[in-house]
Structure formats: structure tokens, C-alpha cells
């Protein structure tokens, strides 16, 4: 079994966080799930899919499995890891990467036991805040943004057919993108394949930064500039989360909407 990477010094910068989720105005069920775990300094959004409530099951399983893996590691750092660690990654990055793989294993095992859920899956985006760096892992089109000063920067690149189209044809207009028939089809998710390879990003931790972790029900309805304005002008994170949800619903609320905000320092 693989060994555990060595842990670093204790974290010093405090965090504040909140998370809200809403079914939106055009869906009866909410298949999004989120977790805001201050003790583990872990923040997750998952957007389920699969029908027959399977999407809701998959998204909740993903959040629970990843948080449980973090909690288990911190309780016993010497235990064997269930997947191979990457010696080039930090502890935080390995925890996220392996935790996402564990979540994928659990979703696939559950799907095999219930034929009604054999097509269930979920996107995932997870943010882990360490002592000196922030690590993001994701699969699918749920996103992580970072507000630093006046700049709201998207830190994740969607795993979706439309994102691949935009990369191949950067001249595509907003109208062409909106009319693209497969714009909601993701190319990477939990549950769809035996192995999942989450995209990883690591950046230095800076006090004053605010991170937004969200499902496509938010970013697909609310322009980045409007999201930035809400976060910058609303210091109270609970109020800012509610305003983000409200903005998506005011734009028609075509999908489930989830937003988690995390302030550093």
C-alpha cells in the first residue's frame, strides 16, 4: 500500500464560510449537494445526474465520501491510502485527488447494487485550504472562482463538450455557444468510469481572498461580472450567498443552484 505524504506546519489564517443551495425555478428536485467543513478546511459542490433521484444520491455520496476521507486521514495519518499517492503533489493535493477517487469508487459500487441507479453520476469541485496554499480538484462543469481585489478569476476549466468547442473555435459568439445543442454535456464526472482523473490546481494562500465554489446553475445564469459585484459589495457571506442564489432565480432559475463562499483571513 502507498505511504502517506508528510504533513506540514499548522494552519494559521482563519476562515469564514457559508453555503446555500436551491432547486431553481424549473426543477422539482434539487440534485446538487454541498459541504462546508471548517474543521477540515474543506469545501465541496457536487451536481448530480442520472434521473430517478439517482443524481441526488450521487452528489450526496460524493460530498460525504470526500469529507469522510479527510476526517479519517486527520484521525489517523498513518493508515494506508486506498489509492496511490503522487509524490510530486502536496499533502493537501493528494488528499483531494485520492478523496475524489474514493468517492468515485463508492458511487460506482452503489450503482452496481441498484439497477435504477446504474447511470448515476455527479460533477465535483472541492477546495482545500492548507497552511500556505489552496488546492482545488474538479471533474465536470462545477467551478471554483477566486476574488482577489477587483479581479474575479475562474480557477477551473470545465470538462464539457462546449468548453472543448470554445477551445477549438475561440471565435464562437455568445449566441452560438447558447445555441449549441450539447452545451450541458460533461466529459468527466464521478461514476461514469472506473477511474477518474480530477484536474488539480494549487496556488499560494493569501489573506483577504474570497473563493466561490458553485454549480452550473449559478454561473450559467449569472455573468461573472455580476457575481463579482455581489461578492465585493456584500461583506456578510450569508447575505452574499443568498444574493447569488436570488440572481440566478431572477434570471429564470433553469437549473439547481449552489454557491459556497470561503473568505481567507
Q: Where does each model-flagged region fall?
A:
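PP2C/PPM-type serine/threonine phosphatase catalytic domain
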Residues: 1-265
